[in-house]
Amino acid sequence: MKKFSLVAAALIAGVALNVNAATVATVNGKSISDAEVSEFFAPMLRGQDFKTLPDNQKKALIQQYIMQDLILQDAKKQNLEKDPLYTKELDRAKDAILVNVYQEKILNTIKIDAAKVKAFYDQNKDKYVKPARVQAKHILVATEKEAKDIINELKGLKGKELDAKFSELAKEKSIDPGSKNQGGELGWFDQSTMVKPFTDAAFALKNGTITTTPVKTNFGYHVILKENSQAKGQIKFDEVKQGIENGLKFEEFKKVINQKGQDLLNSAKVEYK
């Protein structure tokens, strides 16, 4: 069975209008509201308010919506609603939606006891651990000599002076396009994120210090500034309880829906040809 795209499904289903909606565009005399665009892209926005997006992002989404609306208008002009392919695909979509509603009804009947959620957490605490992390900057160059020269330029600097000079040199000399313009900033990472020589060097540093020798990887030679660090720690129950509950609920749902399917199969008259 072919899957309907999010765009196609939304256009077929239509979009609920908000009485307080503001018109953001008109298409062939038809008004387009911010509420329409917001609801249309809701799965993609994942709870983010359309109205708070930067103007360029809002405009891009509005343009996408308009293009889809124009395609819909053109399809109607061509009377494609009577096309056999449309009817066939629509029937498939309706069946899929009906099955989804059926399953959601069952899912909503499943309740997970709070004690069971807590017990799962207590029995699996080793899975809910925040790994040790560091925050660092780096300057990547092609040769060991370049790296040594940079280290010499930074020698003796501390605190804000070191940080500022490091950022300046990163912008000037680093060949890493991903961090160069941010002054070499890499953000936070754990021991599984970077290649081992880089990780080992970064984690071995004290906060606010740089590597005193170049760090060689397959990318070149690095000079690293360790900005901050966080030790390995236990993730609190409140941070993960909703995820645990959802996981347990889904596992129970799979058992229930499989049993339901088996019961229906057993009660049906099925003849294999």
From Swiss-Prot:
Catalytic activity: [protein]-peptidylproline (omega=180) = [protein]-peptidylproline (omega=0)
Record-annotated PpiC domain positions: 131-228
The keyword Isomerase appears for this protein: yes
GO molecular function, one term: peptidyl-prolyl cis-trans isomerase activity
Taxonomy, superkingdom: Bacteria
Signal peptide positions (record): 1-21
Entries under SUPFAM superfamilies matching the protein: FKBP-like
Gene3D superfamilies, per the entry: 1.10.8.1040, 3.10.50.40, 6.10.140.970
UniProt cross-references to PANTHER family, sorted A to Z: PEPTIDYL-PROLYL CIS-TRANS ISOMERASE HP_0175-RELATED, PEPTIDYLPROLYL ISOMERASE
Protein name in UniProt: Putative peptidyl-prolyl cis-trans isomerase Cbf2
